[in-house]
Amino acid sequence: MSAQGDCEFLVKRARELVPQDPYAAKAWLITARTLYPTDFNIQYEMYSIERNAERTSSAGRLLYDIFVNFPDQPVVWREISAITAALRNDSQDKHAQFLKGVFETLPGQVQCKMLLKATEQCFNTLEKAEMLLLLLKRFPESVVQHGVSLGESLLEAESVEDLETPVNCFRKLFVCDVLPLILNNPEMCLPVSLLYKYLHKAAEFYICYVTREPSADGQMQGSQEVGGLNSPGRGRGQRSVIDGLSDKASVVTEPWDRLLEMVGVVGSLCDWQGEKGSRSYAELLQRVSDLCRFLSAADADGFSRCCSQIVSCCTLVLFHCAFHYVSAVQPSLFQGHSSLSSGPWVLLEDLSSVYADVEVERKHTHKKRKLADGREKTMSSDDEDVLAKGRGRHIVVSKSEMLNWAETLDHFRTARESWDLLHSHPSLEAEFAKICSAWKTEMWLWFRIFLTDMIIYQGQYRKALSSLALMSSLQLQQNQNQNQNSLQTGSSSSLENHRAVIQQASCHYALGEYRLACEKLLEAVGGLLPQNQEFVKSSDEQRKPRSKTRRGNDLRLVPCTSKSILPFCLQLMLACFKLRAFTDNRDDLALGHVIVLLQFDWPQGESLFLKAVDKICQQGSFQYENFFNYVTNIDMLEEFAYLRTTEGGRVQLELLPNQGMLIKHHTVTRGITKGVKEDFRLAMERQVSRCGENLLMVLHRFCINEKIILIQSLP
């Protein structure tokens, strides 16, 4: 019998004995190994018996022998692949735990060599990276040799794949696994330029990760495979899962904290001025703000270093605070927020002073004197407060409706300060522009929302309108991308669309473009549903006197709901018509619109209504044929009834449709026909019976039915 035949016989005999007498089987194999020490099959059979019996120590020793003596055998690499696969995942499977134990019994040098060899056997970039990560984590000394090359290979793979987003498997492994090993290794000595490159890559990943759009089902979905890696392309379309990674491997905990910690490490390595380890983003901004004061006095080298430090820190603070602000005012943009539970908020001009007016000399004694003297004027609800003073502007917000109002406005303020700092010097602005270009921030809808609100806050309304146009374009693109998204309901999409339209109306008003403002707000009103009558009552009851009147350049942050937006639209329309109604030129149509709109939030507009009555008395007549369609306020009805009397001045009122034609054909001594007078009395009686109607429904109908005439009434 040949030597090969002898070996096969001995192995076969040992296999037959394993079930009945494993010790006899081992004896046969020990004998065989002594006779044929270079035969692979004999030694592999010995290892297989120990592995199948899950005897960790002996299996480890035998694996060591066959790895050293037969490194090129394919079956050896299949075994090593199974072991490294067990090492790469957190499976609690019994066999996987055994394989990990076998690996742990190997000498460190052999472990290192085995992992390096296993890496060479990998042709998939992800698997190769994961294998090298095992090596780097177990043998930190290898980071110096392999860390940067691994990081660069991941970034190169990302570039070659031409992926749409930084939130991909290659960047995630680089930022969350490889980069911390590189930065925290004291033996590494990287150029400052490379440190900044890596910091910016990490920042882009973390920012894009936290600002991801909602997933299709709002839950983490993905492969249930044991391994941490999938082949790229799997799971595509599952937005919560990073393409190429399992669901568990896709999760990044506390991304903002991780980024802040990384900033501290990079700052220390770059020898930043005043770097003591960042405890918060606000503290980070404070340090670079102090540094900016010395920027002009620095030499060329110092200027360059300071510039890079300031831009990097301010950029991160800007996006951190802008994200938290936008996540409060439009949470449905991001994962982890349900658009069904919280809608958007919108930053608008504060119109609480729309009812204010200068005192005028009264020539008419009013029937309802109590309207002028018996009630104290009110401005806004007592649950509101002011924060964020800057450039002479205030932002008013209801604390009862936005529980985290102080934090939200503080984030808005800090983000604005960061933006201003980044644009305080041409060099800073140029470096920041490079980062924005590389990150394609012009495509970030959430950041455009912040920029728009900031521009509105700055009072640059023409620029704000351009920004709103860009925002609408991005919103349309996002809606098209999410047309299969079950969470993106028509209601939510409509509210977000209203947000932009209402801000456009507010900006046009601030620019004095009242007709354009009216067009936009009427567009928004068409999609709103007025609240029930109870809302009107409770709103009135909650209003209490305020000691001082706010200035006209304040802003108000309000929820983008019918309950809040319809009142704003009515106030804005009133503001648009108010100046036209009370000019020296007679404009009964504008004055009539004002009277209709003054019914809302009554009696806030009492003084303005009384001024309108004074003007009517001075004119001696008033024509508004929509009066009985939309005026249901009892105080107003009594005042107009009084105007017809001798005591009220016998004012000629043309409030019925076609009343003017009747008067021309049937004039009597007092300038009014008896038939018209009777019609007026009956109409007034019918109107009194309507005083209990839902006022918001009446005013909403006014906006819808009279849309064309309202727009045409403005220049």
From Swiss-Prot:
One Gene Ontology BP term is: RNA polymerase II transcription initiation surveillance
Keyword rRNA-binding on this protein? no
Instruction: Identify the GO cellular component terms for this protein.
Output: INTAC complex; integrator complex
Q: Give its localization.
A: Nucleus
What the entry lists under InterPro entries is as follows: Int_cplx_su10
* Disordered: annotated span: 220-241
What keywords sit in the KW lines? Nucleus
Its subunit composition reads:
Component of the Integrator complex, composed of core subunits INTS1, INTS2, INTS3, INTS4, INTS5, INTS6, INTS7, INTS8, INTS9/RC74, INTS10, INTS11/CPSF3L, INTS12, INTS13, INTS14 and INTS15. The core complex associates with protein phosphatase 2A subunits PPP2CA and PPP2R1A, to form the Integrator-PP2A (INTAC) complex. INTS10 is part of the tail subcomplex, composed of INTS10, INTS13, INTS14 and INTS15.
Q: What family is this?
A: Belongs to the Integrator subunit 10 family.
Describe the task this protein carries out: Component of the integrator complex, a multiprotein complex that terminates RNA polymerase II (Pol II) transcription in the promoter-proximal region of genes.
> This chain belongs to which protein, by name?
Integrator complex subunit 10
